[in-house]
Swiss-Prot record:
This protein's name: Methylthioribulose-1-phosphate dehydratase
Taxonomic source organism: Emericella nidulans (strain FGSC A4 / ATCC 38163 / CBS 112.46 / NRRL 194 / M139)
Pfam families: Aldolase_II (PF00596)
Keyword Ubl conjugation: no
Cofactor note: Binds 1 zinc ion per subunit.
Gene symbol of the encoding locus: mde1
Length: 240
């Protein structure tokens, strides 16, 4: 390995005894998400922004086996496109950057501290149900369910209440992950209070101000999606 490559690798950025360090948190989160069935077959991804650094899980690594030394680090801010212009300050030499990177960056540009992408079966199923019931332009809506309180109303607006209606936009899938970026950003603009975007037949992107908020919001949404699927089986409407 050349001296230049060694210098570029900046291993110190992912070496820490602090369990709250992003390089330690991302593998821990990925193991949890794998055990929950959200990120099978190396799918999905997680990214955390800390100050001027963005830490991103790599592509193609089994989520339950991920280690801190697998993590990519970007200087922030950094261009979304073209990929060659992104300011990587640590690149594991034997791994590929996540195809989710430009979508994570779109969330960080809106103030997020963490963004999670899962392939949850419940998320996929609700996109199919919405498409069948409302057509391709429909969004997911649900109300009068206690767990809705786990989702924010919007930046600086507090949390949704029991009687509020949660709305999550849905975008069409594409052949390549990076090509979702434009549609994701349009959905963010059309739904400025949303903290999540569903991808039809694919999964969901969820972001939050910090790791804890992104994780708990993702958990709350997955609960609501599963509940919605079961409600649909029983003929119970999602919005009361």
């Amino acid at each position: 390995m050349s001296q230049g490559l060694q210098q570029q690798n900046n291993d110190h950025l992912v070496q820490s005894d602090d369990p709250e360090h992003p390089a330690n948190l991302i593998p821990e989160l990925c193991r949890k998400f794998y055990n929950w069935g959200w990120v099978t077959g190396t799918g999905g991804g997680t990214s955390i922004r800390r100050g001027e650094h963005i830490f991103i899980a790599p592509s193609g690594v089994q989520k339950e086996l991920m280690q801190p030394h697998n993590i990519f680090v970007l200087q922030y801010p950094t261009p979304k496109y073209p990929p060659s212009e992104r300011k990587y300050i640590r690149k594991p030499l034997d791994l590929k950057p996540s195809a989710c990177t430009p979508l994570f960056l779109a969330a960080f540009e809106r103030g997020a501290g963490c963004c999670i992408h899962t392939h949850s079966q419940w998320a996929v199923l609700v996109t199919l149900l919405v498409e069948r019931e409302k057509g391709p332009e429909g969004c997911f809506e649900i109300s009068n369910i206690e767990q809705i309180k786990g989702i924010p109303k919007g930046p600086g607006k507090g949390m949704l209440g029991y009687f509020d209606t949660l709305r999550i936009p849905i975008i069409d899938n594409t052949a390549f992950e990076e090509d979702l970026t434009g549609s994701l950003e349009k959905a963010m603009d059309a739904y400025p209070d949303t903290y999540a975007v569903l991808v039809r037949r694919h999964g969901i992107y969820v972001w939050g101000d910090n790791v804890a908020k992104a994780k708990t919001q993702c958990e709350s949404l997955d609960y609501l999606f599963q509940l919605a699927v079961e409600m649909h089986k029983l003929g119970i409407p999602w919005v009361k």
